[in-house]
């Protein structure tokens, strides 16, 4: 019994070598980013208020824009884009919003507006590809105003 107890304690130590170890890797990335921030915050590694993550987002956004100056360096662009998304997940945590819910809302809003654009195009007897970007933008602005 004593040996089994020591083995269990050894396994627990291995399992808990980091506060982040309990995060499932299969979570959607945005939710995992949010939960990562929660875990780090739980041990005191966090900004005192929402100003910190907002400043971090601005810093990461600047770095992404700089990386875009070298479009051939796709690895850097991808890394900086990830940093932007991670910083937004942290900011949303600080202001009390679940980023998954916020993103779902934005997607649903886009779907409603896009369907309005499709219906408007259909009412003219044309398909979307025939309208051109200028006309599509007019229909999009109309959808934004109406919905």
Protein language model features and the residues they cover:
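Flexible "arm" and connector segments at domain edges
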Residues: 1-81, 85-147
């Amino acid at each position: 019994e004593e040996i089994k107890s020591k083995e269990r304690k050894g396994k627990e130590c291995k399992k808990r070598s980091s506060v982040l170890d309990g995060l499932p890797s299969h979570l959607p990335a945005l939710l995992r980013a949010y939960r990562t921030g929660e875990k780090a915050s739980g041990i005191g590694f966090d900004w005192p208020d929402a100003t910190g993550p907002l400043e971090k987002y601005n810093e990461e956004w600047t770095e992404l824009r700089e990386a875009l100056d070298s479009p051939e360096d796709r690895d850097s662009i991808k890394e900086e884009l990830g940093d932007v998304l991670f910083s937004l997940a942290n900011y949303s945590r600080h202001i009390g919003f679940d980023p998954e819910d916020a993103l779902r809302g934005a997607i649903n809003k886009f779907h409603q507006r896009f369907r309005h654009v499709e219906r408007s195009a259909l009412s003219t007897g044309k398909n979307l590809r025939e309208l051109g970007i200028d006309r599509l933008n007019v229909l999009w602005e109309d959808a934004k105003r109406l919905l």
